Amino acid sequence: MTSVKFKLPPKGFIARRFIEVAVLVLGRGIEIRGDELVITDCMNFSMSLNNVINNVDKGMNIFLTGNDRKYIIGRMARILGLDVSGESMPIHLLQALSKVIEKSVKDVCITKDLQEEISLLNILKVNFYEYGRAYLSKPKDKFLMIDKLPIFLQLLGILGILVSTVGIIKNQGIRYYVLPPEGIPLKLPPGELEEMLKHFNTAYKILKNYYDMPRSILITRLAMELINTGCEDDRIIAELVGIQEGGKRATRATVVSVEPISTEGLIQIIRTSIIDEKNVKELATKLGLLIDVGLQSLREGLVSGDKTGTIVLRLTSDLLMYARTKSLDSLYSAISILERSKEYIKRDPQEFKYLINTLKERGTEPNLWLSELIRLMSMLIRAYEASLH
């Protein structure tokens, strides 16, 4: 089989970003070369596609307008051999695509009808520069638009939507997606694609649970996870993109926020302050566990009365402040919060039942666990003080 090539949508359109993330997750048999998508090995691509489809949320839907459902999805379904009497779920389209490619793997791989350009799904028309938004400037010569894309590319875009969705705020009609920062570079050095996928998976794992949490909690939890995966420096690891897809006035999908997600110096502070890698990983693991318990507390605290989440919010705020300002007061405050937590647990354990129960399930005494966390955190203070002499 000769390689199959498709011209990608221009940078600045969400369609490009969703296709890129689909290619990143698929990994084998398909790649991006500059502004082209290339299927290099149909057999490997077919196996990768089947594997990814088997692991996505089967019940997830995507934003569709009435025209999308009636004309575009219906057209895709007919070409893929699906029953068009009912509405096809995204997963049904992708499963059908996988079967078509399996049958054509030794021949053309992507059949001619899948290469046909048809009107674009509304969600794939979204761009990052409309209305003068700051994150990408509007083209000076003319307003760039795309109206059509090949069916195959649109199906890859749908796959990208499914694998990058991290959450929905229903009362605002906003869906959040995690995407690699700035997309996939036109010239990616060898070996970096694997690292990009590793970081994307980490960002997805954390943002899936924390996308709606205060920034200090999200950033600290992400930094701890990255430390435990071996990351040695701070970086912008992903973009959290919010798209308005619902609400009373929403007639089409529109980008409403693009937030770079970075570790803001936390990794560097911990790694330069603590020499022993074992202590580094232990601190990251303990803070990660505490934040996970805090997440449960914040989500259910009003009902349960648990206050672990309040402690975690204050602690992570102090840590992030220290990372940004190097103010020792913030670090002292963070450790003081942990010291007082030991007293709070003794005085009223019911208010910290989530933390107590989690630790006891692991065979750990809460006060001893907190004392060890305080010891590890104190290493940051000692390192700071040593740097002054």
Predicted regions and their residues:
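N-terminal functional modules and adjacent low-complexity/disordered segments of proteins
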Residues: I123-V126, P139, I174, R347-Q350, ...
